[in-house]
Amino acid sequence: MRITSFFHRPRIAAAAVLAVAVTAAGLAGTITPASAALAGLYEQPLASGYDSIQSKTVVVTCPTGTAIGGGATIFNGGGKVAVEAVVPDVSAGTLTVTAKETDNYPYDWSVTARAMCAPAPAGLVRIRHWSAKDSGDKTMGTSCPGSKTLLSVGWDVGDGWGEVLVNETNLIASVGSPATGVMMSAREDDNYPDDWTLQTYVVCADPIAGQQWVSGITTSDSSSLKAVNATCPSGLNATGGAAMAVSLNAATQSELSIDSAFSLSVYGGTLNAFQSIAYEEDPITDDWYLISYAVCT
């Protein structure tokens, strides 16, 4: 396991951490599977240092099995720190997470990489797509090959330096079927002039018993912070998920920042839910909402 950090600035006293309530609701899809349910799933977390360094990268390795996905949580980012990369590597059994400050943020903060580890299921593959390198906003779709179904998603913004926000990740799925891919959008914040790239990742496997997806959604209003859970049915784990923050005014979509997206245990027990947290990166007056998707396996 390793941690790297860049661009150190002097520390200033940490800001207070907000506590938020979360809700769960939404649609679901299921399929009749071809193989046994995924077993042996567990979370392996690793946190960065808690300081005011502008960029932090954490690499966590699964002690056993391999990384079939994972997520990231930011502590004390206050909407001024965004998750820039969540990269699962099924060959190395690692999850790499990078977070960067979006503005000159003076307070201490940390990011935690949360690898989802398990014995490799049948047909396990990771698919990666990448965009052209230019200064335009980007939307990309990435799908599982053949009849494989989705376990988790990831992304990596190259040369964005905190000025590019991945704030819309939507599952490719229909009611009655499992997810088979994602549509992902990344947008420039503050008129970022430099060229940058977006890489998207999906981790897929042969269909697994009971596999389905669920979603949770917040109310649509102008509050600056939102959080929501998507909770799997009893007996299933959230092997991955996605977060989608949507402004009702397209002109302010680039001001919404995903703070955290990760699997967790609701009411104890297994990792049965996927939580998404989002902030207004700069204040807006428009209403917006947040959707959390869980891939349940």
What feature does the model see in each segment?
Residues A24-L41:
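C-terminal region of N-terminal signal peptides and the immediate post-cleavage residues
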Residues A37-T297:
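Extracellular attachment/recognition segments
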Residues V20-G26, G77:
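Hydrophobic alpha-helical elements and their junctions with loops/disorder across both membrane
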Residues A13, V22, D103:
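Residue-level detector of functional hotspots within protein domains
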Residues R2-A19:
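N-terminal export and membrane-targeting signals
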